Amino acid sequence: MADTVTGPTILQQNDKRVVIKIVNQSDGSGGTTVFGDVSALDAREDGTAVAHLGLLRVWYSCQGGDGGDSYARLDEEDSDGDIPIIGLTGAGYWDFREFGGIPADKSSNSNQSDVNLVVPGAADDGNMYTIIAEFQKIY
């Protein structure tokens, strides 16, 4: 089996930011889905491609199961081991714009800079995850 995933869907995009939505219904086996694919985003007007994404705001709902397994993570993709950006549990809204957002990891390792939604292997079949995130485009 596989998770039932709707999206990611770009809700709004300009040269400075992008808003992306994804809905994931777990099959109980966990999984990783590319949420923010930097290579698929619109380049700047001068042709410069997006290199990284910085998290500005996130609306989320991670519900179902017995409560101990209804969490998800946003990670920055890296072939040396993904780099956690933020963990999500329950439902809520976080706004990081006051201090410029959660910056992208720009280390010199093999960072691919895509953002992944990670659902744990402990998730119950039927757990629902809805994430809407606003990212700053970093060139």
Label each region the model flagged.
Residues G64-L88:
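Short, surface-exposed beta-strand/strand-loop-strand elements in extracellular ectodomains
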Residues D3-N14, P120-Y139:
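C-terminal interaction-tip segments
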Residues A2-G47:
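Solvent-exposed, flexible loop/coil segments flanking beta-strands in beta-rich domains
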Residues W59-S61, V118, E134:
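Residue-level recognition of well-ordered beta-strand positions that form the cores
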